[in-house]
Regions:
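A short acidic, Gly/Pro-enriched loop at the edge of an enzyme's catalytic core
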Residues: 94-101
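C-terminal lobe and adjacent flexible extensions of AdoMet/dcAdoMet transferase-like proteins
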Residues: 205-251
Length: 251
């Protein structure tokens, strides 16, 4: 189930305005198109469709999937959205396909707190890729302890959202236990005083844990690189579905 910050229609409608700097996606476009030469991509956790549309603008065939219907509805209303296949649901609901690349941007990979959900997602993505296809995603490095900066004082912002009026939001950590950070993201619409609460949880898995999960789900980890726009804070993982399945008993 998607968090209210993505699933509530009023919040989804202002998401892009509150998070307007998406220069982080330039890194993904360079990897997906320039480095891997992808012609078909499935964007897992596509949200309001910013990255999917960026890829479509460069001629890529894109499928965007997300469990937050309100966010996908925002994506569907954007200019050029008709070029993209939008799917409501999680990766396990992907239709049969043979994509060149699958992506999880914006730390989508961390929302799978439960190991079972994480494994089923990776296996579903593996099945959606053609042999030789790649999965590209990011995850915050737990040793950077990013959550220590998630306080109301450090994150509060008030944004002019045009006809909607001023919208205020912030992030505040509730707890950190067993690699899982729980935090609140209140949003206030100044025009009518409406306040929406949203509580989210993110899993800060170690690099070793993520690589082991990828391997267990049939991927070959081809590269783990420092995120160029956030050095020392995030890893970008590249994993490939092998061209040929491993022989039984092979190690």
């Amino acid at each position: 189930v998607a968090d209210p910050i993505f699933a509530e229609p009023r919040l989804a409608a202002v998401y892009d305005l509150l998070d307007s700097d998406r220069s982080d996606l330039d890194v993904y476009a360079a990897i997906v198109i320039d480095e891997l030469g992808a012609r078909s991509v499935v964007d897992v956790g596509c949200g309001t469709g910013t990255f999917a549309l960026l890829l479509a603008d460069r001629g890529v065939d894109v499928t965007g999937i997300d469990p937050a219907r309100a966010s996908v509805d925002v994506a569907r209303r954007k200019h050029g959205a008709h070029r993209i296949r939008w799917v409501d649901g999680d990766a396990t609901g992907l239709p049969p396909m043979q994509a060149d690349v699958a992506t999880m941007t914006a730390n989508v990979a961390q929302v799978f707190v439960d190991d079972g959900a994480w494994t089923s997602t990776l296996r579903a993505i593996h099945a959606a890729l053609r042999p030789g296809g790649h999965l590209v995603f990011e995850a915050r490095r737990p040793e950077a302890r990013a959550w220590e900066e998630w306080t109301k004082d450090a994150t509060r912002q008030v944004v002019d959202c045009g006809e909607i009026g001023l919208v205020e939001e912030w992030v505040d950590v509730v707890s950190f236990e067993d690699d899982v950070v729980e935090f609140e993201s209140p949003t206030i619409f100044h025009a009518d005083g409406a306040r929406f609460e949203s509580t989210s949880r993110l899993r800060f898995r170690s690099r070793e844990s993520i690589e082991a999960a990828l391997t267990a789900c049939g991927f070959v980890v081809t590269d783990v690189r420092d995120a160029p726009d956030r050095p020392g804070r995030e890893w970008i993982y590249l994993a490939q579905r092998p061209e040929h399945p491993a022989a039984p008993g092979a190690s």
